[in-house]
C-alpha cells in the first residue's frame, strides 16, 4: 500500500505499471479516488509536500453528496 498525497490514507494501490520495467507505476487511493504516477514530482507524490490547499479530510468523502461527472469526450 502507498500513502495518498491528497488524503493521507494508507490505501493507495497500484493500478498499472509501465510496459518498460520500473519506468513508472500508477496508483489510486481507495479512500478519495485520487490517482498519481510514481514519476510525477514530489509536490504530487509526497504527502508532506502536496499543496495543503488541495488536501482533503477522508471523513468528508463519506458525506460527499455530489461527485462531478466526467465530461463528454470531444470528437
Swiss-Prot record:
Disruption phenotype annotation: A triple bsdB-bsdC-bsdD deletion mutant no longer converts vanillin to guaiacol, the conversion stops at vanillic acid.
Q: Where are the transmembrane segments?
A: none
Concerning what turns on (or off) its expression, the entry says: Up-regulated by salicylate via the transcriptional regulator BsdA.
InterPro entries registered for this protein in UniProt? VdcD-like
Top-rank taxon, per record: Bacteria
Give the disulfide map: none
* GO biological processes: catabolic process; response to toxic substance
Its biological purpose is as follows: Involved in the non-oxidative decarboxylation and detoxification of phenolic derivatives under both aerobic and anaerobic conditions, however the precise biochemical function of BsdD in metabolism of phenolic acid is unknown.
Q: What is this protein called?
A: Protein BsdD
Amino acid at each position: 500500500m502507498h500513502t495518498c498525497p491528497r488524503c493521507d490514507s494508507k490505501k493507495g494501490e497500484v493500478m498499472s505499471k509501465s510496459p518498460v520495467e520500473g519506468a513508472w507505476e500508477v496508483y489510486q487511493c481507495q479512500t478519495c479516488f485520487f490517482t498519481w504516477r510514481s514519476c510525477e514530482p514530489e509536490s504530487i507524490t509526497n504527502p508532506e509536500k502536496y499543496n495543503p490547499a488541495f488536501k482533503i479530510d477522508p471523513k468528508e468523502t463519506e458525506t460527499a453528496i455530489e461527485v462531478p461527472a466526467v465530461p463528454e469526450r470531444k470528437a
